[in-house]
Curated annotation (Swiss-Prot):
Pfam families reported for this sequence: EGF_C8A_B_C6 (PF21195), Ldl_recept_a (PF00057), MACPF (PF01823)
Compartments, as annotated in UniProt: Secreted; Target cell membrane
Biological function: Component of the membrane attack complex (MAC), a multiprotein complex activated by the complement cascade, which inserts into a target cell membrane and forms a pore, leading to target cell membrane rupture and cell lysis. The MAC is initiated by proteolytic cleavage of C5 into complement C5b in response to the classical, alternative, lectin and GZMK complement pathways. The complement pathways consist in a cascade of proteins that leads to phagocytosis and breakdown of pathogens and signaling that strengthens the adaptive immune system.
Name the record gives this protein: Complement component C8 beta chain
Length: 588
């Protein structure tokens, strides 16, 4: 492990303000590049085998559900349709509207009581209940300014001016755990409840929003290099997935379909490109050296209770029918994501993976451990590579020659087959420099470390499901609403999971985009099902989960379900499925 510290003097006030600017933070924009010897083993494009033929699958939509009963509060009834079969391999797509409502009459004997009794001031438009002392205080505590109407004298809310946390509103957005996209605002992080409680960061006064328990900025940044070597693709992928799963803690109540691909945004071309390169290396003849650096700059934590919801999100939840109608509840998850962020660490992350050809490596005097040691030396800030020694007999035992090989374009006969560089956080200049090098220089790493302060990103986060934001403070029928939202989340994740797609050939990844399944093919493989290749090497196939089976009947207030690792079955040394095969949860 090697560490480089960024001096406190470098963290001036402007950089602090900028690096907490989360306008660029929370939409993870990972820069990724790869390069390698694409011409090796190239021949005329062909199908890998005569058996690998793909047949178009047409999209199929279910019939309309029955109309729901007339909702007392909304005076509407609803119906919906679901995706029965996504299209794949060039099949006919679906063009449809999957939810409808129409006006209906409610008998006079029924009354609407969706808003709980307010013992303070009930805001006119948003329906928010605030303390009466917040009226006429010069701030929009209601979210519609109704608490400031008719005020004769409006005092200043705080005696001293205070800065607002830059980008704090972005942390209030929901997040879709299937693709890591940030969606609509679910929390109001510009609500202060009249408090002027200050927080000082390097002598600058910040005003703490009501929803926040903690927002801490580091006054000194540092990053560590962790260098690992892996004998095989399966070893590397197993380690990578375990690392990724520890970066996002998800409370959900039941497992996530397709957890092996959890959190990847396959709509991001740069993310897709890195996956294509790594999965191409699933043959048995590849080894890996991975170096990872992390720079943590800030921590964010919500309070545990009494959260103030964003007015629009509050109104959307209150407009849901009291009876369970999947189509209406599904739309909440489409618009606002599935979860909200309760804790986050902000900063930067850099991962550099070198893909080695084991057959060529065996013909040299180098070992996998030599590559690991020299990579570690080459990434050490200020390191003297001439002082690091490897296998005896290698040009005096110095890392110099090996690092030169890793730093130049891949040459014929080189053991370095390819590399993948992933950068999160940092300036455009530093990212461009890092992803264009096979082995980054210490100068580029320092430049990236400085850039992270101005443009940090998520490096770890903890999330909880949206339905946990439903409390009796804001909703009359909170128990029913929460139960319906939990049930809808299970249905939504099942309907939107890529497990519904047929397997792609040659270790391609099947991805459900809307109503269409696409195959993300390893580099060197093409076709709608990755069935065409210009390569002769056989690659492994990683296993993937089937969709979850139906929930069992409720017994002892519990129900269970299971799934199989057969979509596809792992073969030729491919990775086994990770995650639960069986699970149980409370009845809902």
């Amino acid at each position: 492990m090697f560490r480089v510290a960024i001096p406190r003097s470098a963290l001036n006030l402007h950089s602090c303000l900028l690096h907490v600017t989360l306008s660029l933070v929370l939409i993870s924009k990972a820069a990724i590049t790869t390069a390698g010897n694409e011409d090796s083993d190239v021949r005329e494009a062909r199908s890998v085998s005569d058996q690998q033929v793909v047949h178009p699958v047409d999209c199929v939509i279910s019939d309309w559900s029955a109309w729901s009963r007339c909702d007392t509060c909304q005076k509407k009834r609803y119906r919906y349709a679901k995706l029965d079969q996504p299209s794949q391999f060039g099949g006919e797509p679906c063009h449809f509207h999957d939810m409808e409502d129409e006006a209906c009459d409610v008998p006079d004997r029924y009354t609407c009581d969706s808003i709980p009794l307010c013992e303070g001031f009930l805001c006119t438009q948003t329906g928010r209940c605030i303390h009466r002392t917040l009226q006429c205080n010069g701030e929009d505590d209601c979210g519609d300014m109704s608490d400031e109407v008719g005020c004769k004298k409006v005092p200043k809310p705080c005696r001293q001016e205070a800065e607002e946390y830059w980008g704090i509103e972005n942390l209030a957005k929901g997040i879709n755990i299937l693709n890591s996209n940030l969606e609509g605002l679910v929390l109001d992080n510009r609500y202060y409840a009249g408090s002027c409680l200050p927080q000082y960061i390097q002598d600058v006064r910040f005003r703490k929003p009501h929803n926040l328990q903690q927002y801490t900025l580091e006054t000194k940044g540092s990053y560590d290099f962790n260098v690992q070597s892996f004998e095989s693709y399966s070893d590397y992928m197993d380690y990578s997935m375990r690392e990724r799963m520890t970066q996002t803690i998800v409370s959900i109540g039941f497992a996530i379909p397709g957890i092996a691909e959890f959190g990847f945004n396959y709509n991001n071309a740069k993310v897709t490109r890195s996956i294509q390169k790594i999965r191409r290396a699933s043959s048995k003849i590849n080894s890996f050296v991975s170096a990872k650096a992390e720079l943590e700059l800030a921590q964010y934590m919500l309070r545990s209770d009494d959260l103030m919801l964003h007015p629009e999100f509050l109104q959307r939840l209150r407009s849901l029918p009291q009876a369970y109608v999947y189509g209406e509840y599904r739309q909440i998850y489409r618009d606002y994501g599935t979860h909200y962020i309760t804790e986050a660490a902000l900063g930067g992350e850099y991962e550099h993976t070198i893909i080695l050809d084991k057959e060529k490596l065996a013909k040299t005097d180098y070992s996998l451990e030599d590559y690991k040691s020299c990579t570690q030396a080459g990434l050490k800030i200020g390191a003297n590579i001439y002082g690091v020694y490897v296998s005896a007999g290698i040009e005096g035992g110095s890392c110099n020659g090996l690092l030169n090989e890793m730093g130049e374009d891949t040459a014929i006969g080189s053991s370095v087959e390819d590399f993948v560089a992933v950068v999160r956080g940092g300036s455009s200049e530093s990212i461009t420099g890092l992803v264009s090098k096979k082995l980054p220089t210490p100068q580029l790493m320092r430049l990236w470390g400085e850039g992270v302060r101005f443009n940090p990103d998520f490096i770890r986060k903890t999330t909880r499901p949206l339905y946990e934001l439903v409390t009796s403070k804001d909703f009359s029928h909170d128990a029913t609403l929460k139960r319906n939202l939990k049930r809808a989340l299970s249905e939504y994740l099942a309907e939107s999971s890529s497990c519904r797609c047929a397997p792609c050939h040659n270790n391609g990844v099947a991805v459900l985009r809307g109503t269409r399944c696409d195959c993300v093919c390893p580099t060197g493989y093409t076709g709608r099902g990755c069935e065409i290749t210009q390569r002769k090497k056989q690659i492994a196939t990683d296993g993937s989960w089937s969709c979850w089976g139906a929930w069992s009947s409720c017994s002892g207030r519990k129900m269970s379900r299971s799934r199989q690792c057969n979509n596809p079955v792992p073969s030729d040394g491919g990775l086994a499925c990770r995650g639960l095969q069986q699970e149980s949860t409370d009845c809902f």
